[in-house]
Amino acid sequence: MAFQLTPLRVALVAGEPSGDLLGASLLGGLHARLPASSRYYGIGGPRMSAVEFDAHWPMEKLAVRGYVEALKHIPEILRIRGELKRQLLAEPPDAFVGIDAPDFNFGLEQALRGAGIPTIHFVCPSIWAWRGGRIKKIVKAVDHMLCLFPFEPELLEKAGVAATFVGHPLADEIPLAPDTHGARIALGLPGGGPVIAVLPGSRRSEIELIGPTFFDAMELMQQREPGVRFVVPAATPALRALLQPLVDAHPSLSVTLTEGRAQVAMTAADAILVKSGTVTLEAALLKKPMVISYKVPWLTGQIMRRQGYLPYVGLPNILAGRFVVPELLQHFATPDALADATLTQLRDDANRRALTDIFTDMHLALRQNTAQRAAEAVARVIDSRKPR
């Protein structure tokens, strides 16, 4: 496949931090693969902007989680999508890449595809876990799906959607053997007792719902395991300010509150208490025992429960096809239960060794040079639509 030297235009939309990570990885591959001076623009975050991406809107405008919570933001989100659609139809890009955010991207992709613009979607929605009816939207909206997990292309191809397994960029980024000692030195935690990383979420609403419960669990853990130390990474300065009162309300805790540096915090840990999400995959790639938890508003939880197919929500369990780490969700996420489960993960050396083997196999399966594979797939789609 050979492109002429004419620069291309690729529009991309990412709606949350995990999409920003994927988008930055893809952009790195596209810069290497497509002609120089090609233009990349749309909606993205700071990681994408750092690799020559022109963000017309910040992704924070789209980063709303949950059914009930999203209602008040719908008018602005629809306005942004409508304006972006008009721009892209008026000046069609050579390809559009929607990165996750299916509720935003599928409607946009369907309109663009109908106008003859090639559409690629990066991250297959978890149709194998819940809301399987979305496959009908995928068929209408997507020319090609870039899949993070190896079992997804077969499911899509049965429905008539072209797909490529590209692996996960975190598996490329994270070393197979994490440097726990080096991470502790970086955080100022070189000696002393065991370390537990606590990650209550990357959104204000998540921290407000589960943060107090996590900190109460930390208090119980310190009572039951004297000498234990905690590190709590905050994704942004605003979230650090939100977490600080929880730290102040528990003065007896030995806790280090950081800004950013979530991967360093998890690398430094002996065990992790984590709110469900992509970060659980990161914890698995770091070979760490963990407890996965979440709390969402009651109505959101009821909707999610009724539309789910699998008995687990954490990516490590989904990829393993069984429970390999505990999940404590909704009303089961009490301080006592979280403390007990996390300390069990901390203390069980046989379980730690077994998890290391399981997570190493996952790591190797997902380590595929994602940036290059994804960029090659995008290039093939663009090339297939060029006049011969």
Swiss-Prot record:
Coiled-coil regions listed in the entry: none
Pathway(s) per entry: Bacterial outer membrane biogenesis; LPS lipid A biosynthesis
Catalytic activities: a lipid X + a UDP-2-N,3-O-bis[(3R)-3-hydroxyacyl]-alpha-D-glucosamine = a lipid A disaccharide + UDP + H(+)
Role played: Condensation of UDP-2,3-diacylglucosamine and 2,3-diacylglucosamine-1-phosphate to form lipid A disaccharide, a precursor of lipid A, a phosphorylated glycolipid that anchors the lipopolysaccharide to the outer membrane of the cell.
Keyword Transferase attributed: yes
Gene name per UniProt: lpxB
Gene Ontology terms describing biological process: lipid A biosynthetic process
Annotated GO MF terms: lipid-A-disaccharide synthase activity; phospholipid binding
Family classification: Belongs to the LpxB family.
UniProt keywords, alphabetically: Glycosyltransferase, Lipid A biosynthesis, Lipid biosynthesis, Lipid metabolism, Transferase
Protein name as annotated: Lipid-A-disaccharide synthase
Species of provenance: Burkholderia pseudomallei (strain 668)
EC number: 2.4.1.182
Pfam families: LpxB
GO cellular component, one term: membrane
